[in-house]
Amino acid sequence: MSQSARELVANVRHELAAVLPERPCCREAELDALRDSGRRSDVATARTVHQLSGDSLVIAASGTPRELALRRATMLAARRAPQHCRSAFLRGRILARGSLSFARGGSHLELVLARAEAIVLAQAFAHVGFPGQLRERRGRGRSE
């Protein structure tokens, strides 16, 4: 990836991380998305987690971060789910598990997820006008 492409990706991540939801329900949705970050760590995401969790009442939920993300994704993929919470969760999943790739044919967003969550998240993205494809890479589920 060229230097300008890396800078663009970093700028997009920083812009997404700068959006702080006003509603408590949206903050909790985004936190659920960010808690399961895999091996990724960057300053923008860490700052967002700190800002979102600093002023909210965190209620202990049972399950691993991956299980909590799948539960939240399932709730927000429902057609009647609040759009504001769905957007906050999707933004968090992009920050936590997303990568932006550039090729000759254009650009695409990839999310590295467990297959169960990828299927549910594809529905949630479709509800906000971003239909995607599910692909399995290297034996792991991946949603584009």
Predicted features by range, described:
Residues 2-38:
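N-terminal basic/disordered segments at the start of proteins
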Residues 30, 37-144:
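DNA-contacting interfaces and partner/effector-binding or oligomerization modules
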